[in-house]
UniProtKB/Swiss-Prot annotation:
It catalyses: heme b + (2E,6E)-farnesyl diphosphate + H2O = Fe(II)-heme o + diphosphate. This is Protoheme IX farnesyltransferase. The chain crosses the membrane at residues 9-29, 39-59, 79-99, 102-122, 139-159, 165-185, 210-230, 231-251, 261-281. GO terms for biological process: heme O biosynthetic process. It comes from the Bacteria. The gene is cyoE. Converts heme B (protoheme IX) to heme O by substitution of the vinyl group on carbon 2 of heme B porphyrin ring with a hydroxyethyl farnesyl side group. Pfam families: UbiA. It is found in: Cell inner membrane. One of its GO terms (cellular component) is plasma membrane. Belongs to the UbiA prenyltransferase family. Protoheme IX farnesyltransferase subfamily. One of its GO terms (molecular function) is protoheme IX farnesyltransferase activity. PANTHER family: PROTOHEME IX FARNESYLTRANSFERASE, MITOCHONDRIAL.
């Protein structure tokens, strides 16, 4: 029971999703090869980054305890129900943070550690606080969400270059329509706690147009690894096909479907698209 509640506090779904994008960066750096040469490093960076993301999610839960208690989809979180206390959660999050730093420093490299720490700070210190204050919090949160593939890349090459920037842009532009789709689907919950989400402040129509704008930027960014010469033809074709397919389905839904169906369409295909792109990167 308690193990399950502590696991829920770390948001395993978010961890898993971020590890998929990390894999994309790792595969780009190794040209889609994870053999005996790279397998230990791959395991180490996965563990280190997973621990840091888990720590960030724990501290996010602590800060959001008050609004989580008022939203239907978050009312059963461990801190809200009292299964885990704030003190216990703080200790848990701190242990995860320390373990992550140790793994990344000793078993990966210092650059990757610093990159992941930046992601942690942006997520916990900037995004978590700013989402109560500004409609731009989702964009700020996109910075932290775009960090894992960069970390996967630097774990191998130990440098920041244009390929790392390309990975960052792909994930950053992907996250905005993905996140706004979630905001549209749970708009009633966000209204309850008076969070200034874009669909609430600017309206659904404006949000949908912005989602399509970022989707177009995402499609363009998917060509960058190939343009830079780091991704092969197979990766380029897969990336462009799935990105264009997502764009097509979203525009089609925008023209014909209700707002909720549009949000569901964008969200559903966002998961399929980013998984396909990350697992064929290289």
């Amino acid at each position: 029971m308690y193990f399950k509640r502590y696991l829920q506090l770390a948001k395993p779904g978010i961890i898993f999703g971020n590890l998929i994008t990390l894999t994309g960066g790792f595969l780009l750096a190794t040209h889609r090869e994870i053999g005996f040469e790279y397998l230990p490093l791959f395991v180490y960076v996965m563990i280190g980054v997973a621990l840091m993301i888990a720590a960030g999610c724990v501290f996010n839960n602590i800060y959001d305890k008050d609004i989580d208690s008022s939203m239907t989809r978050t009312q059963n979180r461990p801190l809200v129900t009292g299964d885990i206390s704030v003190i216990q959660a703080t200790i848990y999050g701190t242990i995860l943070l320390i373990l992550s730093c140790l793994v990344l420093y000793y078993l990966v490299n210092l650059l990757t550690l610093w990159i992941i720490i930046i992601g942690f700070i942006v997520y916990v210190g900037i995004y978590t606080v700013s989402k109560r204050l500004t409609i731009h919090a989702t964009v700020l949160g996109g910075i932290s969400g775009a960090i894992p593939p960069v970390a996967g890349y630097t774990a191998v090459v130990n440098i920041l270059d244009y390929n790392a920037l390309a990975l960052f842009l792909i994930l950053f532009f992907w996250q905005i329509p993905h996140s706004y789709a979630i905001a549209m689907l749970y708009i009633d919950d966000y209204k309850k706690v008076k969070l200034p989400m874009l669909p609430i402040v600017k309206g659904i129509a404006c949000t949908k147009k912005i989602m399509l704008f970022y989707l177009a930027l995402f499609v363009v960014s998917c060509a960058l690894p190939a343009v830079l010469g780091s991704a092969d033809l197979f990766s380029f074709i897969v990336c462009m096909l799935v990105a264009l397919f997502w764009m097509y389905k979203s525009i089609q839904s925008y023209r014909t479907d209700t707002d909720r169906v549009f949000a569901k369409t964008v969200f559903k295909f966002s998961i399929i698209v980013i998984t396909a792109i990350c697992l064929t990167m290289g």
